[in-house]
Amino acid sequence: MHCRSLPPIANPGSWVLILGTMPGKVSLREQQYYAHPQNLFWRITAEILGFDATSAYPLRVSSLKDHGVALWDVLQSCTRESSLDADIETSTIVPNDFDRFF
């Protein structure tokens, strides 16, 4: 399966960048970072930053931005059969453009 990363979540004032490799199948399908219900990302960040982890995705994203946190992925695209990084076909890796991002 060919995968394309989600757009970055960031504000000009973001000072923390959390990087993943490539969103999993559920996240890509939902077009939401860390969308798999077993992923603890939103519960942990909500606990640290003081927002409701069960709120709608746009509200969670807004909370991250309000706290200066940005999200993105190292890869712009790749091919893999599962959601595991170990399944990424290295010959298909295209990195994101970090020069443009920063």
What kind of region is each of these model predictions?
Residues M1-F102:
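A polyanion-binding, active-site-adjacent surface
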